[in-house]
Amino acid sequence: MKYKRIVFKVGTSSLTNEDGSLSRSKVKDITQQLAMLHEAGHELILVSSGAIAAGFGALGFKKRPTKIADKQASAAVGQGLLLEEYTTNLLLRQIVSAQILLTQDDFVDKRRYKNAHQALSVLLNRGAIPIINENDSVVIDELKVGDNDTLSAQVAAMVQADLLVFLTDVDGLYTGNPNSDPRAKRLERIETINREIIDMAGGAGSSNGTGGMLTKIKAATIATESGVPVYICSSLKSDSMIEAAEETEDGSYFVAQEKGLRTQKQWLAFYAQSQGSIWVDKGAAEALSQHGKSLLLSGIVEAEGVFSYGDIVTVFDKESGKSLGKGRVQFGASALEDMLRSQKAKGVLIYRDDWISITPEIQLLFTEF
């Protein structure tokens, strides 16, 4: 079995009727495929949108609401109804499901990140299928992941999945928008996610969901940099999930980095919030970015911000102004200033095990398009 542990992300458009309401037949089809894969020995996680779609009608809304409070209320009602649909269908095959609602803070806070990882590990080891969504009812912008594409990639990286599958209404990444460009061709295999790939992703998306192809590509960066390959394929076929697991479905395959980031490095790269800035000289910049060395105090030119021992800072090349990466400091800001002022600074500010270099691929995640 090539892909034992698989994370599936199912978007709103793959779960709803034309009027935006939840399609029970589509949910049933998804659970049947999950059951077949589970019985074949796969460990599965489902990241599912659709809470708002499942709940807005029950609150008397004629169509999907647009106001934040209305959407949060609809999600509060719909999350239970959606889970009931999944749970009922899976129990018919004697499969236990579990609900987990996450926010960005569950990834940013290292203790909560560890707790979420442990809970998911136990569920998978006990043969349950975790069903995950963002906690839309209470989340605020500062703690919001933003879309389930990103959430699914974060989860796939966290549990070190063997494959992440995006099920959508577009059967992969095209060179243009296939809905309007007859010359657009699907890319079957993507080795590296670069600016050209990002530009190609600026087209297709549907009105019911919140994420188009661009969010999927940026999410794929998180997964592939963490060692998890990604497959984008259509949800329109009745056996699309099974075919994706067997690599017989038409779609776009994103190759994972051969040496994916470990859990600690994932946290540093994607979630750790910087509390300050450090500027270094040319020698220190080369030692960090080219030779995998620790950051010595002797290479520091300037420091800015209020940070304490153990906090995360961003390091810049003083000469070029380029961001080199992030790391955990061994000294607070005031102690560091005193040592730099004495001009006798010796020792290590950031050890290499507490450091992550920002690659061009990772940098794209923090670029506005």
From Swiss-Prot:
Any one Gene Ontology cellular component term annotated for this protein: cytosol
Residues engaged in binding substrate: 49, 136, 148
GO biological process terms, semicolon-separated: L-proline biosynthetic process
Pathway: Amino-acid biosynthesis; L-proline biosynthesis; L-glutamate 5-semialdehyde from L-glutamate: step 1/2
Annotated compartments: Cytoplasm
E.C. no: 2.7.2.11
Domain PUA: 275-355
Positions of ATP binding: 9, 168-169, 210-216
Keywords from the UniProt entry: Amino-acid biosynthesis, ATP-binding, Cytoplasm, Kinase, Nucleotide-binding, Proline biosynthesis, Transferase
Pfam families linked: AA_kinase (PF00696), PUA (PF01472)
A GO molecular-function descriptor: ATP binding
Reaction catalysed by this enzyme: L-glutamate + ATP = L-glutamyl 5-phosphate + ADP
InterPro entries named in the record: AceGlu_kinase-like_sf, Asp/Glu/Uridylate_kinase, G5K_ProB, Glu/AcGlu_kinase, Glu_5kinase, Glu_5kinase/COase_Synthase, Glutamate_5-kinase_CS, PUA
Family: Belongs to the glutamate 5-kinase family.
PANTHER family for the chain: GLUTAMATE 5-KINASE, ISOPENTENYL PHOSPHATE KINASE
Function: Catalyzes the transfer of a phosphate group to glutamate to form L-glutamate 5-phosphate.
UniProt protein name: Glutamate 5-kinase
Organism from which the protein derives: Streptococcus pneumoniae (strain JJA)
